[in-house]
Curated annotation (Swiss-Prot):
Mg(2+) binds at D253. Pathway: Purine metabolism; IMP biosynthesis via salvage pathway; IMP from hypoxanthine: step 1/1. It comes from Schistosoma mansoni (Blood fluke). This is Hypoxanthine-guanine phosphoribosyltransferase. Homotetramer.
Length: 284
């Protein structure tokens, strides 16, 4: 079915999927404003611009959306979630439309960085399983940015699998598998695509390993970074800084559940108990 929008001089025809996409972006913008108003992201007189974070050697310069500890999210009944997770979620922390809007800007920042470095190609390394949705949407944004600018920046994708949690407990030593032939990374610009950085142990281990493979550069783009105590000092290019709560959805999981949620949500005690498994790994 097609819907026509009539202007004074022309007729613009959009498919329903295009209309839904426009509405999704508009909703994301409105929700972004609500988050800003509720969480006091902007300078409140107590900090000097908390959105701008110091850059480490493995960081691509980008602003960070900070969701404060005082922000209590959005009621789940206002969003589409699976009946399987009824009573398992505390609230929606980041709606999907807001995620998509943030990734558009991250994509432009990343292309800016590699253009400035005169990079001839990028190898994106997705950290599975939680990073696959972030990767798909990020690559889509990168490709749109490259096309719009009329530049040549070939991209390839590799995958590495990491296990770092059992239930809500970070295990003592993250397990990395699937890196493949080490020679494939020699003299490559590697962009690690991670879903969330918590303690920083997993990403630090992965960067150290990649550095040993004679890569040209190793950078990290993470959808989320969690405010932990003691504070995790590793600062990648990041979409959102979030409170130290266990988050699920948008491919982030709790024992391989909740990956199918459209939004990023905070799991509650009922959900943790319902989907818990016996813990055999040594905690941190």
């Amino acid at each position: 079915m097609l819907t026509s929008l009539i202007t004074s001089s022309t007729t613009v025809t959009l498919t329903l999927s295009q209309i839904y996409y426009i509405l999704d972006i508009a909703c994301g913008f409105l929700i972004s404003v609500l988050v800003w108003m509720n969480s006091s992201v902007l300078d409140n007189g107590n900090h000097s611009n908390p959105q701008i974070r110091d850059m480490s050697s493995n960081m691509i310069k980008a602003d960070c959306v900070v969701i404060e500890d005082s922000f209590r999210g959005f009621p789940t009944e206002y969003f589409c979630t699976s009946p399987r997770y009824d009573e398992c979620l505390d609230y929606v922390l980041i709606p999907n439309g807001m995620i998509k809007d943030r990734l558009e800007k991250m994509s432009m920042d990343i292309v800016d960085y590699y253009e400035a470095c005169n990079a001839t190609s990028i190898t994106l390394m997705c950290v599975l399983k939680g990073g696959f949705k972030f990767l798909a949407d990020l690559v889509d944004g990168l490709e749109r940015t490259v096309r719009a600018r009329g530049i040549v920046l070939p991209m390839s994708v590799e995958f590495v699998r990491v296990k770092s949690y059992v239930n809500d407990v970070s295990i003592h030593e993250p397990i990395l598998t699937g890196l493949g032939d080490p020679s494939e990374y020699k003299d490559k610009n590697v962009l690690v695509v991670e879903d969330i950085i918590d303690t920083g142990k997993t990403i630090t281990k992965l960067i150290s390993h990649l550095d040993s493979l004679s890569t040209k550069s190793v950078k990290v783009a993470s959808l989320l970074v969690k405010r932990t105590s003691p504070r995790n000092d590793y600062r990648p290019d990041v979409g959102f800084e979030v409170p130290n709560r266990f988050v699920v959805g948008y491919a982030l999981d709790y024992n391989d559940n909740f990956r199918d949620l459209h939004h990023i949500c905070v799991i509650n005690e009922v959900g943790q108990k319902k989907f818990s498994v016996p813990c055999t790994s040594k905690p941190v």
